Regions:
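Enriched - but not universal
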Residues: 5, 31, 62, 98, ...
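Cytosolic nucleotide-utilizing catalytic cores of signal-transduction proteins
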Residues: 103-283
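Alpha-helical/coil-rich non-catalytic "connector" segments in signaling and regulatory proteins
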Residues: 1-72, 221-283
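Long, mid-chain structured domain cores
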Residues: 26-133
Length: 283
């Protein structure tokens, strides 16, 4: 058998984790999506006439193919990109359930390929998922016989709704270039991969830089605040003195920026990302 994990049935009904392939007029072969390779996915796409064997519902259509309307209006979106270097088909379902449990603000998830999964998060109220995933990664890999790398995407507010598909694809393209070169398990922030990508040729798609810069410009005094924090190695008291404002006022702006974007200006990786974005404004 080519697909020993498959099963035959007399109707095309398949759950969200399966794909149904017509064998005859009254017989379909059901396969688990997680067991399919990229080549098999393309073959099934040709056989079924679908764009992809990994048809993950409305969010998949909206983000991957830029089709339809945003399935659910939320004030801020974040994408968690997961790539599995090693996995066992028998444990994928349990791993997905665990991920849905530890990401309480998840509103959807879908499969991009046999090794790639996306979780869509509602970050209207900020949930620090990076810390949760870093704390649990080793246990997850051990419990479910997996080796995976995770990228925490940037938080994008609803004002960029028309660009969500392009932003998602730009994020994922950067993540793919990362794991193709650095194949080890870890949890990485958007800032880490963005700064890594700056040093590579054509790794950062312009829309990422453009939209982040727009966010910075939308916040009062933020360019000056980022520059002052950079010059004072993120020491808030010194930066406030340089800006001639009260320390609490500066802290308010820092907290407001984190609430909007998840970026922490007192954390040097996030601060470096923001400083790179404002360099053209201050040079």
């Amino acid at each position: 058998k080519w697909f020993p994990q498959g099963r035959l049935q007399s109707n095309p009904n398949a759950n969200e984790n399966e794909v149904a392939i017509p064998i005859s007029s009254n017989q379909w072969l059901l396969l688990k999506k997680s067991s399919l390779t990229e080549r098999e996915q393309e073959l099934i796409s040709l056989l079924t006439g679908k764009d992809s064997a990994f048809d993950g519902g409305p969010w998949y259509d909206y983000l991957v193919h830029n089709r339809g309307k945003m399935p659910q209006n939320v004030q801020k979106l974040q994408f968690v990109h997961c790539h599995l270097f090693h996995y066992e088909n028998e444990t994928i379902g349990s791993w997905l359930e665990m991920m849905r449990t530890i990401l309480p603000n998840r509103i959807a998830d879908f499969q991009l390929s046999s090794q790639d999964y996306i979780f869509v998060l509602d970050q209207t109220r900020l949930v620090p998922v990076k810390d949760v995933l870093r704390d649990t990664l080793s246990a997850i890999e051990y419990d479910f016989s997996l080796t995976l790398t995770i990228k925490i995407g940037q938080i994008w507010p609803l004002i960029f709704k028309e660009s969500y598909s392009e932003l998602f694809q730009a994020e994922h393209a950067l993540f793919v270039k990362w794991w193709e070169q650095v194949q080890h398990s870890n949890v990485h922030s958007f800032s880490q991969l963005f700064l890594w990508g700056i040093g590579q040729k054509d790794f950062i798609l312009p829309i990422l830089t453009k939209k982040l810069h727009q966010l910075i410009e939308s916040q009062d005094q933020l360019v000056d605040i980022i520059a002052a924090l950079w010059e004072n190695t993120a020491v808030v008291t010194k930066a406030a003195q340089q800006l001639y404002i009260h320390r609490n006022t500066l802290q308010y702006h820092i907290d407001k920026w984190e609430e909007l974007t998840g970026l922490q200006l007192k954390e040097l990786t996030d601060l470096t990302l923001c400083y790179q974005l404002i360099l053209p404004d201050i040079l």
